[in-house]
């Protein structure tokens, strides 16, 4: 299998950037149909190794060669640059958060479920991850997941604190982790909450959304018929965000520097014993088992807020990109990736799975993982998870929300309602621009 180095990818990306500007029309391609299928994933080095094995198995079974390029940094920028040169990869595997933008730009093709072998084995709920605002499908589900709360169990037990089941207990635990020397080293060097709070890709909104929902608030409220209203400045949203502001600004239980952290930057701070509570996806379980120790941390459902325990539940999609000269091979790869064989290979990835919860109904989570923590994840996904609203393109809503929350948590105003009102006005304008306002 041929792989290009990150340097080569960067060089190609710069060349693409110089070739022209992106547009909302489908990208054309000058690809040779005899070349290998070019596949990109948003990956770390660890997950790239898992994908390599899966693609090798695909080639062994089908004879279709894959030119695999894991993208470690600036994924969205590199896709944009390739689109500008009208030479998109054949297949892209990335999170569902990219769906709206990919559709808007004309970068991904429509999926006909009935034409895809094995599509009937994909659970209906997972198909929602690939559905556009127009009701059509533009991505094939590959993996699903729900946010869970990771806690340093050894710290909690040392301080004789219960497993938190409510916001009040969670916040109390965060204060104790910050103030009561849970690691016993005699130093004031630990914090309660770890937050990937950068505005890049709207990460902070990804993290905060679960807590806003648990407080009874929302970023956007669905009104039916593909129409939405803004909920970010409602009394419930405001109260939920005030709670988070207090954790940042008054209790000071959040890891310093969190407002510039991406998820990849945040993970090592949990591993190194700097922070003890982490609301995140379950994909780090394997890595943390090795780096932190399986016996030193626990995986729990998010503690309940005033309105419940709802958390963000999304996943990864397989996008068959526009302009490909290899449409038959695109389809073959998508069909293989949703088979039980490929799904289980993705789940068993060491140290990190690329399939968290399977989309194929014939794959047994408990039998594959044999780990009660993954049963917890599956239970949360089934009963508490929800996606972001299916507006035509949620990216600008997530980005604007992230920027405002970042400002509130950094500046610590006594009253955040004015900034939330300004954000609400901006989101209303965006809804109007997307013709999705009530």
Model-derived features: where do they sit?
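C-terminal lobe and pocket-closing loops
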Residues: 282-294, 305-403, 438
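Extracytoplasmic "Venus flytrap"/periplasmic binding protein-like
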Residues: 54-123, 154-165, 268-269, 276-277, ...
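Short, low-complexity disordered leader/linker segments with a strong preference
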Residues: 1-38, 60, 425-438
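Glycine-centered hinge/linker elements that transmit conformational signals in sensory
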Residues: 174, 225-258
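Short, well-ordered beta-strand elements
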Residues: 32-44, 64-69, 90-91, 138, ...
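Hinge/lid segment of periplasmic solute-binding proteins
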Residues: 96-147, 186-189, 204-207, 211-214, ...
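Conserved C-terminal helix/tail region of periplasmic/extracytoplasmic solute-binding proteins
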Residues: 157, 381-438
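Extracytoplasmic/periplasmic solute-binding protein
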Residues: 138-142, 147, 171-229
């Amino acid at each position: 299998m041929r792989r290009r180095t990150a340097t080569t990818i960067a060089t190609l990306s710069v060349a693409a950037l110089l070739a022209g500007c992106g547009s909302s029309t489908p990208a054309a391609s000058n690809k040779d149909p005899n070349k290998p299928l070019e596949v990109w994933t948003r990956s770390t080095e660890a997950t790239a190794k898992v994908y390599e094995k899966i693609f090798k198995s695909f080639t062994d079974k089908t004879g279709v060669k894959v030119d695999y390029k894991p993208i470690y940094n600036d994924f969205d920028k590199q896709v944009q640059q390739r689109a500008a040169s009208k030479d998109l990869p054949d297949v892209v595997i990335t999170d569902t958060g990219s769906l709206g933008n990919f559709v808007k730009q004309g970068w991904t093709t429509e999926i006909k479920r009935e034409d895809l072998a094995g599509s009937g084995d994909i659970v209906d709920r997972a198909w929602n991850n690939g559905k556009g605002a127009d009701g059509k499908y533009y991505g094939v589900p590959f993996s699903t997941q729900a946010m869970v709360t990771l806690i340093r169990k050894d710290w909690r037990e040392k301080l004789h604190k219960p497993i938190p089941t409510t916001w009040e207990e969670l916040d109390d635990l965060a204060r104790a982790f910050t103030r009561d020397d849970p690691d016993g080293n005699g130093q004031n060097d630990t914090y309660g909450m770890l937050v990937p709070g950068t505005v890049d890709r709207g990460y902070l909104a990804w993290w905060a959304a679960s807590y806003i929902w648990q407080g009874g608030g929302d970023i956007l409220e669905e009104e039916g018929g593909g129409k939405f209203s803004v909920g970010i400045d409602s009394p419930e949203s405001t109260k939920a965000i005030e709670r988070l502001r207090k954790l940042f600004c008054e209790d000071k239980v959040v890891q310093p520097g969190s407002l510039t952290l991406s998820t990849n930057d945040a993970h090592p701070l949990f591993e190194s014993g700097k922070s003890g509570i982490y609301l995140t996806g379950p994909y780090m379980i394997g890595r943390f088992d090795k780096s932190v120790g399986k016996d030193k941390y626990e995986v729990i459902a998010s503690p309940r807020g005033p309105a419940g325990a709802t958390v963000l539940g999304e996943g990864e999609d397989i996008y068959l990109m526009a302009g490909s000269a290899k449409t038959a091979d695109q389809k073959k790869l998508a069909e293989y990736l949703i088979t039980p064989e490929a799904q289980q290979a993705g789940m068993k990835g060491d140290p990190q799975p690329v399939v968290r919860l399977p989309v194929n109904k014939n794959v047994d989570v408990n039998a594959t993982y044999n780990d009660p923590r993954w049963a917890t994840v599956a239970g949360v996904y089934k009963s508490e998870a929800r996606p972001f609203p299916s507006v035509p393109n949620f990216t600008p809503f997530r980005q604007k929300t992230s920027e405002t929350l970042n400002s509130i948590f950094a500046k610590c105003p006594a009253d955040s309602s004015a900034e939330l009102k300004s954000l609400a006005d901006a989101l209303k304008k965006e809804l109007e621009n997307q013709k999705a306002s009530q």
